[in-house]
Curated annotation (Swiss-Prot):
Region (Disordered): 497-530
InterPro entries from the UniProt entry: Nmd3, Nmd3_N, NMD3_OB, NMD_SH3
Name of the featured protein: 60S ribosomal export protein NMD3
GO cellular component labels: cytoplasm; cytosol; nucleoplasm; nucleus
Length: 530
């Protein structure tokens, strides 16, 4: 018979109180260990946390403000990060202890562990109280304070429409270029962007210069000065003028520019305005482009813009064989759509839209023969040259929104102050410009690729009803195919991106402060030179 010895647990007396306990390396009972060692030593039991009443955000040091609901995981993370001394212990658990919402108190229950003696680990539960203190964040301070701007960018364009600003506004939103603005005001001929420091304004001007041809002029106004310390306080104004040209305008090139572009034109169509201005000669398919510097050295203006566009009906198209990209040279027979039933005037013209137009299509163009142009605008015309009677610029479709049916997509707009006491014709003009911009988005895939377009809440159902309504009204099949597909639209996820955007803005703020110091040093050097 095999004997199995039974191992009995050794018991000892606690060296402090004499209670019989199982043997352990400390030779002390749990109560005595707790009385002798406090593992929460060095961890504060009461802290403060800053909360902005205006935007309901909490301060996460050093300068980041985060949105968090009461008793949420996000707020718990912010509170734990404020506790010093947790790196010396092991955090096992953390949770909330309920408090009255109006008490301005937050209580967090923590469970921690720490090795107190050799191989002896002590666990303890305790509560830390956070006192909520009110403090305005930087954004709310800027919003509440008046006349705190340091720099203003005055964006202007001398044209009779605002389609360019609608497009630029979408690019600003897509790239978040307006994140550092204090305020944005709408003006009759443009927009004003206000900034807290000059560096942010200069970055914004650089962004505008990268997307459209502009001319910039800087001025400054002395606000105060300290002669003893050789310091001064200025307000800066950046006047940014956009070239007075838009897509589908027709222009007469000055002789100097026409010569630089290989003697093209001189009557040409503006096909694109980005950081360069692109032209095409509708009679030869000759293309060219000029920079903002070239334009402002020899400025010129459009002979006609989209308000003078006339609708034509294409009767016949004969391709000549010459092509360039998506354009093809052709002889087109057409008549004014308004002349149907009134007269039988038919015109033969040459156009660059040969592979876009088919017999029966509608096209928009300019009635050059019936227009009166100043002699200064036709300075590029030679004596042996004649203006064409008509110039076509693009294909069009019957209006799809005469029945005022809702679109299944939308684009966002920058929050800004509108024009004070606008007149009725200004409101009507803005609505027409907006509708024209919406139609350009529908018809131009390249334009859609550059901006963010979002789905409506019930986009699929709206699109289905819209197409059905268009079919009932006899809209052309090609126009129906132009309707934006749902897979090309974005979901509105702005709420999920808020915190990340704020982190980016805080980084920009820090960079702006550093760069401002560099600019201030440069100004001091300039003053010394003077």
């Amino acid at each position: 018979m095999e004997y199995i010895p039974q191992v009995k647990q050794a018991n000892i007396l606690c060296c402090m109180c004499g209670v019989l306990i199982p043997a352990n390396p400390s030779n002390m009972c749990v109560d005595c260990i707790k009385s002798q060692v406090d593992i929460t030593e060095g961890i504060p039991k009461q802290l403060t946390i800053q909360w902005c009443r205006g935007c309901a955000r909490y301060l996460q040091p050093p300068n980041h403000w985060a949105i968090a609901e009461l008793e949420s995981r996000e707020l718990l993370t912010i509170c734990i990060k404020r506790i010093k001394g947790l790196n010396k212990v092991k955090l096992v658990d953390a949770g909330w202890v309920w408090t009255e919402p109006h008490s301005k108190r937050l209580k967090v229950k923590l469970t921690i562990q720490k090795e107190v003696f050799t191989s002896a680990i002590l666990q303890q539960i305790f509560i830390i109280e956070f006192i909520v203190q009110g403090q305005q964040c930087d954004k709310c301070q800027k919003f509440e304070a008046k006349d705190t701007w340091n720099s203003v960018v005055q964006l202007r364009q001398k044209v009779d429409h605002k389609r360019t600003f609608l497009y630029i506004e979408q690019l600003i939103l897509k790239h978040n270029a307006h994140s550092q603005t204090l305020n944005i005001k709408e003006k009759p001929d443009g927009l004003d962007f206000f900034f807290s420091n000059r560096n942010h304004a200069m970055k914004f001007v650089e962004f505008i210069s990268a997307i459209t041809p502009v001319k910039t002029k800087k001025s400054e106004q002395l606000i105060s000065s300290d002669e003893q310390n050789n310091a001064a306080n200025y307000k800066y104004t950046f006047s940014v003028e956009i070239v007075p040209l838009s897509k589908d305008d027709i222009v007469c090139l000055p002789p100097k520019i026409a010569h630089q572009l290989g003697n093209m034109g001189p009557l040409v169509v503006v096909t694109k305005v980005s950081n360069l201005i692109h032209f095409i000669d509708p009679n030869t398919l000759h293309t060219g482009e000029i920079s903002a510097l070239t334009f402002w050295n020899s400025p010129f203006r459009a002979l006609s813009s989209y308000k003078q566009l006339v609708e034509f009906t294409v009767l016949d198209v004969n391709l000549t064989g010459a092509t360039r990209g998506r354009y093809a040279l052709s002889d087109i027979q057409l008549m004014r759509s308004a002349d149907f039933g009134a007269n039988d005037n038919i015109y033969d013209i040459r156009s660059h839209l040969g592979n876009i137009l088919n017999p029966g299509d509608l096209a928009l163009g300019y009635d050059v023969a019936s227009s009166n142009f100043p002699d200064s605008d036709l300075a590029g015309m030679k004596k042996n040259q004649q203006l064409p009677d008509f110039v076509l610029v693009k294909k069009t479709y019957p209006s799809k929104n005469d029945f005022r049916f809702k679109r299944h997509w939308y684009f966002k707009e920058i929050p800004k102050e509108g024009i004070e006491n606008p007149k009725k014709f200004e409101i009507d003009q803005m609505e027409r410009d907006r509708e024209e911009f919406l139609r350009e988005i529908e018809a131009d895939p390249e334009l859609r690729s550059k901006i963010n377009i979002y789905k409506e809440a019930d986009a699929a159902n709206i699109l289905q009803q819209r197409i059905k309504k268009m079919q009932e009204h006899g809209i052309d099949e090609d126009a129906i195919k132009e309707e934006l597909a749902l897979d090309g639209l974005l979901d509105d996820m702005v709420n999920n991106l808020t915190i990340n955007d704020e982190e980016f803005e805080d980084e920009e703020d820090q960079e702006g402060e550093d760069d401002d110091e560099e600019y201030d040093d440069e100004d001091e050097d300039d003053d010394m030179m003077e």
